[in-house]
């Protein structure tokens, strides 16, 4: 019999960070839906302003607060929930739940943990307890010993025997974990590993070099009934974090005995921790025989469970929430099939491939090798009916400029077999591209296996693609059968045209004449054995007929955001879902095209039709041919939609909203600059230089500093502010190729200016706009900036000029829908630096801060016009809202933390307050590892920029109760100094509570910044922000903890 609590508190995961991303927006949203179906009142604590779940329709009450125990206690004290769910917000939520239990908060207020209980969570997440639990239940684990100190770790490593894997307890994304081949390796890194554990514990485990890694997803109810939902095979062997691995489902290389044995072990692991809900179990399999070890389990929804849910069509999060309420598996209906109960295990008649997406080129000094710590910022998932088709589709989905496994930049690069094998041995990201290159250059299967440990089954498949492509290259024409085979192997029109040295139009014409078109197949969880009631689909060339009939009428295709990367994250999924809901009022049918397994937009019950497939011109045209969509919307999914808008329009596609030609003007720097001049709108001086002489001439005219934007990057550092000739020419020489083909854009950098933005909607005549002001000065990328609504330091005169500029642009470009304009304001004069004719990164924040959904307003603007009389309208603010960036420095091994014009943050948090400082502090505290410093601790404050702000920061921190040191090489007037070596020692000894610094000082303070982030010490990288946060510390006791609507926010 199920229990029905009246009110349930759901804990979210906070801002997006590496290893804890949008999968928890998906899982949390599903949990809230499952609770609402039962008539249970829901309360959500989550500071992630960009997510779908922090919209009002999901939870009855929403608290945008730091996801930490003391803030959640305030909510419990006020709301008095009967139950709490901690399994849908990642490791962050589990840690909060354990803390609330240990501190007696749950017991004090009579709050029951729903789902897996705290003792089960501790058994799973403490490496020592997990090992003991497995041994007690006769389940196989690798030889290992736990440790809580450096000395104990070194001693136990000798007992276990090198090489060893160091695993970290109560940890996210493998932070601090490593493979130590020698005692020297271990001594060098063990302190960092212990620092990254929530409970200060690590496991020293025998390293299983080149063993196969596998994952099983299992559901279990309170009666012990279990269903194994998916088996996921990692192509990367042990030693590479599962979040860094390319994976396939279902498993491709297991025989039945291996599969069944591990399936049985999975159910036993779930039983041993008394799981109620869902968990994933990770295994190591010896490729040379029937030998397996259990590695770990996660007793919560995870990245893998989100993937399994999207791969199988089984709604894991929804079912898990129902089980947490006391339902049994046979009582829950699978809403994808609409017929089967949740105890039916999925059966797949297709192959799913997931590939992570990295953005390591944005970070200086970062270690490029894939290892035990997760560094990828997103992932893509493809579906095909052969491994080759699925893999090639996934490669294109990465949006890294590769047309597939073969035929791209790496495949055609000047690279020898030896070089390709070297990159493979180093475990570079996107290894499959180097595997193909190695085969092209003559490597054997055995040679590639030796350096990678990747199963020969998969290597043979990739070699087959290389052989086929090389055969294509010697053809003068392509016959129908060869073209069919190419498409079945996942080759795009672009790849085929490159091989034949023809145009893509030529290949498409032959396809059309021969009727070689993909078919639409349904994902129904049971391989077509039962009819599906949801339209969850993919396209494949390995089939003969469509699984459904296509309706007629007024239909819209929406382009999603694709795989997340730095700059494109969950905020664009919020825009896609918002547009989907708004568009349903204007269209008979709305379909979504997207391929991100983490998101709400790719969930089974969000869209009327979901195409889980590629986002490119070829695929959109295929879908239009089948579905006869009247419009395509490209503006809600970030840059990926804008990048194909013009070509779609050229192919006769009608775009919803602003025209492709207007988008092209906004995206093209020269065209946009001429437009601004025509309208009399100020912009920073700039030049597109094709030689060093042109650069020198421009710099002599405008002076330093200047902002450099190369069009062709060699070193991975795309933009830089140069303060001197030496700095500028050294950067241009080192970082970029300069020529008429690859011009470098140099613009005047306006110092000590305020950066501001307008998020808005236009109907071509009027504008609805929201002004956002940055705390940091101009020069810090808007994605890394702290933002305030309403504005604080801008004058009314400046804001009025900004509004006039925005209105002029909206009318001139006939903007229909959402847009974002970025300004630099100096001496009350706004200068436009950028216009984006699409939904923006900040739009969920500005919408929720003002209580008005800009995407909903966009649809009104497009079809009915904006419904107010003013030319320009900005809704009033009732209270304060502040958005803060979330950085993932600790995950990015070796990189130097600093802020500049290149975006580095992975997510964002926001909070509301009765004052600016109330909102700012809660927002800042929502990003890990930020926390209130312990009084009587030490702060380091130093830098070479914003010196007045740094000095005032130091004064505030002294008032707060800290001992503040500056560094003797960079002294601050009136602040005690210590030398750099002493500062490094204090950080390494974990005696420093907070570091506040400013400027690019890599040669001077690399060790201070890097050690601080490695040891989870809060670091503020801007003097102005440091000043505002230090001032907020002084009012810490005045923080407010209201529900979002009490601040006048929320949508």
Curated annotation (Swiss-Prot):
Region feature Oligomerization domain, mapped onto this chain: 400-548
GO cellular component: a single term: cytoplasm
Record GO terms (molecular function): ATP binding; carbamoyl-phosphate synthase (ammonia) activity; carbamoyl-phosphate synthase (glutamine-hydrolyzing) activity; metal ion binding
Enzyme Commission numbers on file: 6.3.4.16, 6.3.5.5
Residues reported to bind Mg(2+) 3: 822, 834
Cofactor comment: Binds 4 Mg(2+) or Mn(2+) ions per subunit.
UniProt: Mn(2+) 4 binding residues: 834, 836
List of residues binding Mg(2+) 2: 296, 298
Entry keyword set: Amino-acid biosynthesis, Arginine biosynthesis, ATP-binding, Ligase, Magnesium, Manganese, Metal-binding, Nucleotide-binding, Pyrimidine biosynthesis, Repeat
Pfam families on file: CPSase_L_D2 (PF02786), CPSase_L_D3 (PF02787)
Gene Ontology biological-process annotations: 'de novo' UMP biosynthetic process; glutamine metabolic process; L-arginine biosynthetic process
InterPro entries tied to this protein: ATP-grasp, ATP_grasp_subdomain_1, CarbamoylP_synth_lsu, CarbamoylP_synth_lsu_oligo, CarbamoylP_synth_lsu_oligo_sf, CbamoylP_synth_lsu-like_ATP-bd, CbamoylP_synth_lsu_CPSase_dom, MGS-like_dom
The protein's annotated pathway: Amino-acid biosynthesis; L-arginine biosynthesis; carbamoyl phosphate from bicarbonate: step 1/1; Pyrimidine metabolism; UMP biosynthesis via de novo pathway; (S)-dihydroorotate from bicarbonate: step 1/3
Annotated region described as Carboxyphosphate synthetic domain, given as residue ranges: 1-399
PANTHER family assigned: CARBAMOYL-PHOSPHATE SYNTHASE [AMMONIA], MITOCHONDRIAL (PTHR11405:SF53), CARBAMOYLTRANSFERASE FAMILY MEMBER (PTHR11405)
Quaternary data: Composed of two chains; the small (or glutamine) chain promotes the hydrolysis of glutamine to ammonia, which is used by the large (or ammonia) chain to synthesize carbamoyl phosphate. Tetramer of heterodimers (alpha,beta)4.
Similarity annotation: Belongs to the CarB family.
Main function: Large subunit of the glutamine-dependent carbamoyl phosphate synthetase (CPSase). CPSase catalyzes the formation of carbamoyl phosphate from the ammonia moiety of glutamine, carbonate, and phosphate donated by ATP, constituting the first step of 2 biosynthetic pathways, one leading to arginine and/or urea and the other to pyrimidine nucleotides.
Protein name: Carbamoyl phosphate synthase large chain
Organismal lineage: Archaea, Thermoproteota, Thermoprotei, Sulfolobales, Sulfolobaceae
Encoding gene (name): carB
